[in-house]
A protein has these predicted regions:
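A short, structured loop/turn motif at beta-sheet edges
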Residues: 13, 40-44, 67-71, 91-100, ...
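Short, cysteine-centered beta-strand-loop-beta hairpins and adjacent loop/turn segments enriched
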Residues: 53-60, 109-115
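Hydrophobic/aromatic beta-strand elements that line small-molecule binding cavities or substrate pockets
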Residues: 5-7, 36, 50-52, 61-67, ...
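Short, charged/polar surface micro-motifs in flexible loops or helix N-caps
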Residues: 43-45, 53-58, 66-73, 82
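A general secondary-structure signal for short beta-strands and their flanking turns/coil
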Residues: 2, 43-45, 58-60, 85, ...
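Beta-strand/loop substructures that line and gate deep hydrophobic ligand-binding cavities in soluble
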Residues: 77-133, 139, 148
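Hydrophobic ligand-binding cavity/cleft-lining segments
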Residues: 1-44, 149
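Hydrophobic pocket/interface hotspot
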Residues: 15-20, 26, 48, 65, ...
Length: 149
């Protein structure tokens, strides 16, 4: 399974990076996030338990988050939950007054014969892409000062 979600935000790359990397603040900022608990770690690498919902359907996972502020990258490896093994990378690229933000999710399920289909259509299309799209859209609204609708 491979998904990509992106948005262009008019704002400061460091401010956007700070908001995107502070996952413990997401439930306050992103209505579709139920909770985020930092389980262990330090300023650049930590273990987090995250819970969101996809239009009322609850999902939960645990991931290792690694921050690379110099290159404006955020990495996650899902270590528990149905998405275990998923690799996620946030890419932030400045372009004048704009910042292009892209989230890439990759998951390989080898459960023959339907594992790849479940990974792509159920996990990828129905959940990952939906939640990532809402996350990017809401961060854009906060940064650009439009509030959350």
């Amino acid at each position: 399974m491979h998904t990509e979600n992106s948005v262009t935000i008019c704002g400061n790359i460091n401010q956007i990076y700070a908001m995107a990397s502070a996952v413990e603040q997401w439930p306050r900022l992103l209505p579709h996030y139920r909770w985020v608990h930092v389980l262990s770690g330090n300023a650049t690498e930590r273990l987090v338990e995250m819970a969101a919902h996809r239009d009322g359907f609850p999902v939960r996972w645990t991931a290792r988050q690694r921050l690379d502020p110099v290159h404006h990258r955020i990495y996650f490896t899902h270590v528990r939950g149905i998405s275990r093994g998923m690799e996620v990378t946030w890419f932030l690229e400045a372009d004048g007054l704009l910042v292009h933000v892209r989230i890439v999710h990759d998951l390989t399920w080898r459960w023959p014969p339907i594992g790849p289909l479940i990974a792509h259509y159920i996990i990828g299309e129905l959940f990952v892409s939906n939640i990532a799209s809402k996350t990017l859209r809401t961060i854009k609204q906060h940064i650009e000062g439009h509030g959350v609708s």
